[in-house]
């Protein structure tokens, strides 16, 4: 009498629900997906449409030097974006997967950049290069971009 007990049906499930809730809160950080037009030459316009299960971003148009980015939270599993890219050089249909693994591949914890160039669709990776002076008492780092071709125009 007077003791508060958790009902037996919730005892194990309550702990499981609590753990899943904590994991979802700690694993849903903000993230950006960026599409950048770096086409050169006469035919430089990029037209694309991207959508996910929850959102349709519609058709967009970028000229060289322009970019578009979307911010969202990565779920505990994966967030899938599908995009149709159209240029005078060809077209690419690509599934852009926003996941924890892709964040590692991009080299940036907050943003993944997809770059459209004359020969295809690239994923921009950021590498950190460390420097120090000859005495070793001053250190600094520089972020270097490196584009990896993921899909050629068809």
UniProtKB/Swiss-Prot annotation:
It comes from Arabidopsis thaliana (Mouse-ear cress). Residues 1-30 form the signal peptide. The gene is SPH12. Its main location: secreted. It is found in: Secreted. The keyword Cytoplasm does not apply. The keyword Metal-binding does not apply. GO terms for cellular component: extracellular region. One of its GO terms (biological process) is rejection of self pollen. It comes from the Eukaryota. Belongs to the plant self-incompatibility (S1) protein family. This is S-protein homolog 12. Keywords: Secreted, Self-incompatibility, Signal.
